[in-house]
Structures are given as structure tokens and as C-alpha cells.
Regions:
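C-terminal amphipathic alpha-helical interaction region
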Residues: 12-208
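An acidic, glycine-/histidine-flanked metal-binding catalytic module
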Residues: 1-5
Length: 208
């Protein structure tokens, strides 16, 4: 072009005009973008399980084959491999979580609960009028969370054993993992660190 600067500006203007429907300068991590994407008719892909099938969308196949990058069969293979990788990864994470809850957290909490109960008995035997409200509050709370943990663990085991596809792991196993983490995280704030089987968040953040 004779006037490079003008040609560049014209090209930028043309490109912006043609693609303005996908430009968003707000918070892409908030509901603001979800609402805006819906207004623009853009897909809202919430997880990798939802994204992977795009490998074999007609438009994807057409583009990859046109450019000589991959064939339809290769794209289908890649889609299946990615879905299997995801399912395998979540399966490993879930079973690791099950193992840790069953062999580390639950036994440690039981030991702590027994210790608190024994402490209450010892204090009461020494002085019948002693106020053990604090110990009782801890005992009740820890026991309740222990029951929640066991129930969540059973649910996660069932979900993991039944899961067969990436969709199963995403829609059933991941929520079950989150449900197990909730009471365990709360127990970490209650159980004496001497009984807790792994470093706490506080120890990792401030004592390392």
C-alpha cells in the first residue's frame, strides 16, 4: 500500500467490525460474561467434557481436513482419547481421595473423638461439677462431621464404582468428591493438629 499507516488502520477497523461480536472487555470469569455470551449467541462451554466433542463438530472436521492437519477419523480418535484421559484422571483422583479418607482422616478423627470423650470422663471423675461444655461442643461437632464424612465417602465409592464415561465422572463423581471434601475441611479446623494425619493448610502456608 502507498500509505501503510492508513492501510493498517483500515484493516484493523475492518477486522474489529467483522469480529466485534466476540470481543468482550468485561470480567470473563464472572456471570457477566455468561449473560453476555448468551445475548451474542455464543456457546458457554462449562467444562472440558463439554469442550472435547467440538473436535468432531462439522465445522472442525471441515477446517482440519481443508488445511490438511487431521482427517475426520483422526479427530474422532483424538476425541475418544481425550475423554478416556479425563475419565482416567478423575478416577485416579477419586480413588486416592477414597483411600485417604478411609485410611487417614476417618481413623484420625475417631481417635480424636475418643480422646475428647475420655478427657471429659476423666475431668468429671476428678470433679463432678466441672464444666465440660467446651469438650462436649467439640465432641458433638466432630462426631456429626465424622458421620457426614462417612456418608460422603460411601456416596463417592458408589459413584466411582458406577462411573463408566467421562460424563459420568464429571456429573456424578466430581460433585461427590466435593461433598466429601466439605466435612473433611471443616474437621481440619476442629481436630487437634497432633491427631491430624497430614499438614494443615495453615501449616503449609505459614510454617514451611
Amino acid at each position: 500500500a502507498e500509505d501503510f499507516e492508513k492501510a493498517a488502520i483500515d484493516y484493523i477497523y475492518k477486522t474489529m467490525k467483522e469480529n466485534k461480536n466476540i470481543v468482550f472487555n468485561g470480567n470473563g470469569y464472572s456471570d457477566e460474561w455468561v449473560e453476555e455470551a448468551a445475548k451474542r449467541g455464543l456457546p458457554n462451554v462449562k467444562s472440558i467434557v463439554d469442550a472435547i466433542p467440538a473436535y468432531t463438530d462439522e465445522s472442525s472436521i471441515e477446517m482440519f481436513e481443508k488445511l490438511g492437519v487431521m482427517t475426520k477419523r483422526e479427530l474422532e480418535a483424538r476425541r475418544e482419547i481425550k475423554l478416556e484421559e479425563y475419565a482416567g484422571l478423575i478416577n485416579i483422583e477419586a480413588r486416592t481421595m477414597i483411600d485417604m479418607a478411609a485410611k487417614l482422616y476417618i481413623p484420625s478423627v475417631i481417635a480424636y473423638v475418643n480422646s475428647v470423650a475420655s478427657s471429659m470422663s476423666t475431668v468429671k471423675n476428678a470433679y463432678a461439677q466441672a464444666d465440660t461444655t467446651a469438650q462436649q461442643t467439640i465432641l458433638v461437632k466432630a462426631s456429626s462431621l465424622l458421620a457426614d464424612t462417612q456418608q460422603a465417602l460411601d456416596n463417592l465409592k458408589a459413584a466411582t464404582d458406577a462411573a463408566e464415561t467421562a460424563k459420568d465422572f464429571h456429573e456424578k463423581v466430581l460433585p461427590a468428591m466435593a461433598a466429601l471434601r466439605t466435612p473433611v475441611d471443616e474437621l481440619e479446623t476442629i481436630v487437634d493438629s497432633e491427631y491430624w494425619p497430614v499438614p494443615t493448610y495453615g501449616q503449609m502456608m505459614f510454617e514451611v
